[in-house]
């Protein structure tokens, strides 16, 4: 299905395009869907930031990303697991909502850590928590890692800070922008049941 122009649409064709773009986002770093804006709730109000899409499970309807468990994001999710993820690319916006499930000291996080490359593991070796005030611009990394990737043994120190967030989706909205007129659909489900669609005015 070409996302640049809406052909004869069905709920099935929209879901197929939607999950295909999400799958590309996980696999391809240059895909527009490789990153999403994650919205959470903080004591100050709404909080949003980009995350990298690391997991797409179409069969179960689950998305996932990695984070540092010392981050404000993690604390916000512990207080309120409700999240919204927003993707945009090729004239298509996808909003996905669910309740985050946090993984740190479990098999899900262990497996994700094993699959994470050394250069990505380096992010979790920062000596202070993300968001900590600093007197100068800094990466927070140990000096010897500022221009190099850690070896396997060095990277192991980041495991304690590494965490996985999975989001079993309960609701998705698809919006296609087109000169001929935009198109919009909403999909919802109960638990891990089937998706039910409805058309919306854009």
Spans of model-derived segments:
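Binding-site signature for planar aromatic cofactors or substrates
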Residues: 1-202
């Amino acid at each position: 299905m070409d996302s640049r122009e809406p052909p004869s649409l069905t709920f099935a064709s929209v879901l197929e395009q939607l999950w295909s773009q999400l799958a590309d986002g996980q696999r391809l770093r240059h895909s527009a869907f490789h990153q999403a804006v994650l919205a959470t709730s903080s004591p100050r109000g709404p909080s949003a930031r980009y995350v990298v899409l690391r997991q797409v499970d179409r069969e179960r309807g689950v998305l996932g990303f990695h984070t540092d468990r010392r981050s404000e994001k993690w604390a916000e999710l512990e207080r309120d697991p409700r999240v919204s993820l927003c993707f945009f690319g090729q004239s298509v916006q996808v909003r996905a909502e669910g309740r985050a499930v946090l993984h740190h000291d479990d098999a899900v996080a262990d497996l994700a850590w094993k699959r994470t490359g050394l250069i990505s593991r380096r992010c979790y070796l920062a000596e202070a928590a993300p968001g900590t005030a600093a007197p100068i611009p800094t990466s927070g990394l140990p000096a010897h890692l500022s221009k190099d990737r850690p070896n396997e043994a060095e990277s192991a120190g980041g495991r304690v800070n590494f965490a996985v967030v999975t989001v079993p989706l309960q609701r998705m909205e698809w919006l296609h922008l087109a000169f001929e007129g935009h198109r919009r659909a909403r999909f919802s489900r109960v638990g891990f049941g089937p998706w039910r669609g409805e058309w919306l005015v854009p």
